[in-house]
């Protein structure tokens, strides 16, 4: 018997298994969806989330946040995980249009950067939950040095909102 028999038994077992049921991958997207359908579902979900985000933030609030960005000497953007990637992407876009912006995703470097900030600087912290201790410590430190904090976070009340000078809310739609 030995190894060849084991390989044969495994291949027979795999061949005799019924097709596995479709499993959910993300919201309405299922593992057996054709690629085009998965793409269409993803576009629909993202569009709905963007409209919900637009509707939850007033025009006045958007203008106030734009004014904060324009008046900042330096914009320090941060986030953890996927929010850090959003911060990095937004920093690049701000730099392209002439803002002094930098994304700091390493939390030790973030605290050092914020401690060396001035009252004219702005911390733009991105966190859907707003509960990450590192981001809230950075926000506290920015306020201590006299700077401002702009949070992009979820609508549910959280610690980051309490520290922020201004908040923009984002909506994630899960079903």
Residue map of PLM features:
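Surface-exposed amphipathic alpha-helices with a cationic face
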Residues: 139-143
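Glycine-rich, charge-decorated loop segments at or immediately adjacent to ligand/cofactor-binding or catalytic sites
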Residues: 157-169
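HTH-adjacent hinge/linker in prokaryotic transcriptional regulators
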Residues: 2-60
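A short helix->loop->beta-strand "cap" motif at the edges of active sites that frequently abuts
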Residues: 144-148
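Short, well-ordered beta-strand core segments
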Residues: 75, 123, 149, 167-168
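Conserved small/polar residues in nucleotide/adenosyl-binding loops
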Residues: 174-175
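Short gly/ser/thr-rich secondary-structure transition/capping motifs
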Residues: 56-60, 103-109, 149-151
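Glycine-rich, small/polar surface segments that engage phosphate groups of diverse ligands
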Residues: 67-133
């Amino acid at each position: 018997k030995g190894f060849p028999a084991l390989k044969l038994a495994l291949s027979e077992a795999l061949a005799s298994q019924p097709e596995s049921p479709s499993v959910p991958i993300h919201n309405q997207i299922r593992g057996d969806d054709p690629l085009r359908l998965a793409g269409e579902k993803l576009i629909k979900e993202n569009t709905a989330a963007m409209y919900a985000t637009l509707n939850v933030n007033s025009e006045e609030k958007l203008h106030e946040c734009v004014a904060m960005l324009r008046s900042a000497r330096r914009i320090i953007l941060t986030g953890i995980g996927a929010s850090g990637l959003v911060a990095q992407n937004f920093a690049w876009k701000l730099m392209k249009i002439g803002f002094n912006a930098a994304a700091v995703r390493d939390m030790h470097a973030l605290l050092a950067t914020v401690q060396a900030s001035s009252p004219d600087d702005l911390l733009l912290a991105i966190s859907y939950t707003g509960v990450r201790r590192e981001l809230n410590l950075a926000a506290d430190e920015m306020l201590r040095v006299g700077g401002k904090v702009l949070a992009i976070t979820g609508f549910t009340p959280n610690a980051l909102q309490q520290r922020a000078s201004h908040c923009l809310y984002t909506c994630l739609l899960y079903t």
